[in-house]
Amino acid sequence: LETLDVLPTATILTIGAVKFDPFGDDINEKKCEKFYVRVDVDSCDRIGASVSQSTIEWWGNQSQAAQDEAFGLENRISIEDAMAQLYKFCWGAKRVWSHGAGFDVTILEWYFRKIGKAIPWSFWEVRDTRTIFDIGINPNRPPVLAHHALEDAWNQAVGVQNVYKTLRTSTTYNGGFIQPFANQR
């Protein structure tokens, strides 16, 4: 997500997501199912979404390319249409990953509730990339345009796959292979 606030009620500028298998390594070529929409901020305002001055100022310090993508006027759709499309995209996913446990998912869940749509995941299916990147394994994330919702989603998915791959090929103190998340697949 790219937003105009950091609260769960934040106005959404763009939504980006990718489908990926954390146990795979096929996402490195950017060959994955993608979701990307630019949201009409007026539609967010109509349902009571928030904007913060500090976030607007923060955007002023980001790259021109990121600002152009986040604030460009072309191809914007209503938040209701964006959430309906995201619902379909996420339906049936075994896990939902976000970059921070308390940001993207809480904002999206607020919108799903606000527009009267079911949340397409359960609380136990939510995963956090920041936590996995913090365990001390280099995620080898490729360079992308920072603060572009789709580019960031792809970058984070590659990082998750790289960390999982490293864990799967690591050995324990007695020489056995680590079997992360064996019953979670």
Predicted regions and their residues:
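Substrate-recognition/cap helix-loop segment adjacent to the acidic, metal-dependent catalytic center
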Residues: Y87-C90, G102-F123
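Short, flexible loop segments at boundaries between secondary-structure elements
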Residues: P120-N140
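Conserved non-catalytic scaffold segment of RNase H-like nuclease domains
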Residues: L1-S98
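Generic detector of well-ordered alpha-helical packing
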Residues: L1-T3, V105, T129, A153
